[in-house]
Every structure is written in structure tokens, then in C-alpha cells.
């Protein structure tokens, strides 16, 4: 397997709480029915909404795009597998872009503290492994990304 892209995003939970309170239609527009049902069953829904929003952003960064290129807000959603692990679900334009890039899997990790939600996504393909010099560049990029994420966590 080869790495197609990596994305990291974080969001202050208080900002999500404010968005929910000020614009209730925001969650209906942004999140799928399944995501809303899950988040609303929890003790602190804003944490889970923030984590899912950060996950969307991380997935889109891993694909090399944002909510541009005709990608709809619900084209990326987060579900849980039978073990409770987060799984990225792609639809519409996001699924099309992933298919064009040969993405076979998106590994997703979500975490949050009292104040911040953070998500990390790695898009993986079945492509032939890159040449040695390209592999070093990808490894350096991955190391730099993890260092940046670690420095953010250290500041918390």
C-alpha cells in the first residue's frame, strides 16, 4: 500500500457549540441523519459534532481538496464500525475524487479534550511503491506532519 495523502484538522469545541446555538440549521446542513442521531445521544453533543467536522476537514486535506471542487457538506461523513472505530464514508464528488486517485482506504483517527477536537486522516492506495528518492520525500512530509500535530498537542 502507498500513501496518497495525509490530513490533520482541529476545531475548538466552543466554536461548534456557538454554531449550533446561533444557527440550528447548520447541523442539518452539515451532518447526515446518522451523525446527528449519534451526536444527539451523547452527553456533550458539541464535542462529537466538532470531532466529526474536524474529521471531514482532515479527510478532504488527505484527498488534496477542501469543500471546493463541487464537494457537498455531506459527501464526507463519519460513522463507527462494530468496534466503535471512526470510519470515513465518502459519497458524491468526494467519492469520485478518491476513486480517481486510486484511494482504497482512509484511515481516520479522532480525539478530543475538553476544549479541542482533532482528527487525522490518511488516504491509502494500492499503487506501486514510490522510488527511493520519492519515498524519502513522502517520509519526510509524513514526519513533518506528525511533528506539527504533536506540537499542537504539546501546547494544550
Residue spans for each PLM region:
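Core catalytic alpha/beta fold that binds nucleotide/phospho-ligands
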Residues: 1-6, 10-156
Amino acid at each position: 500500500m502507498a500513501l496518497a495523502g495525509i490530513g490533520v484538522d482541529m476545531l475548538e469545541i466552543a466554536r461548534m457549540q456557538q454554531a449550533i446555538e446561533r444557527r440550528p440549521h447548520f447541523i442539518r446542513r452539515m451532518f447526515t441523519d446518522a451523525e446527528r442521531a449519534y451526536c444527539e445521544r451523547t452527553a456533550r453533543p458539541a464535542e462529537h459534532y466538532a470531532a466529526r467536522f474536524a474529521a471531514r476537514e482532515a479527510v478532504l486535506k488527505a484527498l488534496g481538496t477542501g469543500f471546493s471542487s463541487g464537494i457537498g457538506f455531506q459527501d464526507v461523513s463519519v460513522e463507527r464500525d462494530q468496534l466503535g472505530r471512526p470510519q470515513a464514508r465518502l459519497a458524491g464528488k468526494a467519492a469520485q475524487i478518491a476513486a480517481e486517485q486510486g484511494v482504497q482506504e482512509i484511515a481516520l483517527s479522532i480525539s478530543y479534550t475538553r476544549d479541542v477536537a482533532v482528527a487525522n486522516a490518511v488516504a491509502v492506495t494500492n499503487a506501486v511503491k514510490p522510488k527511493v528518492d520519492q519515498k524519502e520525500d513522502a517520509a519526510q512530509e509524513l514526519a513533518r506532519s506528525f511533528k506539527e500535530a504533536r506540537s499542537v498537542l504539546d501546547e494544550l
